[in-house]
């Protein structure tokens, strides 16, 4: 049985609605054949935007959010101590935002991961679905609607995550490439060694948000996108990777190694791998999963144990256990690199 089924029975049911009155929800108990009966246009989405000194491009980002075809959207902005005009720009949008409410809160000022974590666990943020958002991208108009349409086919109690490819654009907005097109299925075995998509493409339903919030209450994480992918697949949730680029990721001086399309970015990641940075990230991910073992399915727990053991002992033992665990990256080259990194004890 997927562990999310046990979790939803314990999930806190009281919810705070900040702007609109709560919509009456069906009292019918969910079962595997019970579809989400709330019409897609009635699904309220909370956009969780983390900001810090983003005045240069945040206006274009906000323009693309307002242009979304989905009608019900609340914008939550957690500012991590901006010293430029970011806060003033966001506040100027309050009167223009005609999709719902705009709320601004103070971030924890401990980095972007902690900033997103603060919003994930914030019980004041109440919605049917939640979308992570950066401060300098451009969303395609149907980015939210596409995700909601996919989710409509599932029981509302199943943790769901939608993500997609990204197009990469220059500082001036010209598209210069796309992130790699992945073809392997999303799974926990993939999530253990790879984050499949950027957080700026992720939308999760309420069941997934509650699950990730529970898991995040007792641990910090490396990045919100990777952690969300790990937790949802560990608990038996469903992940959809859309091959279409639904977000244009802006490449600029402050994030030159953030995209997947430039050789500079790839070389930088390779350098971090062999410096042991990836091993440190894996340590943190495994530590977070260990304290949340109760959410793991039996299969995920078995895979986690094998993968954890594969990082210890002699070379042949490590490679044997790694293969037995079944973990994989999305490309053949990536999986070969994974095994090479294991040989050099860099994961």
Q: Could you say what each language-model-derived stretch is?
A:
Residues 6, 19-20, 30-31:
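Acidic, Ala/Val/Gly-enriched low-complexity intrinsically disordered segments
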Residues 8, 17-19, 58, 117, ...:
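Compositionally biased, low-structure terminal segments
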Residues 8, 22, 39-41, 52, ...:
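Generic low-complexity, intrinsically disordered sequence content enriched
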Residues 10-15, 23-29:
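Basic polycationic patches enriched in arginine
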Residues 31-261:
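Nucleotide-sugar donor-binding/catalytic module of glycosyltransferases
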Residues 217, 221, 227, 248-347:
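C-terminal subregions of glycosyltransferases and related glycan-biosynthesis enzymes
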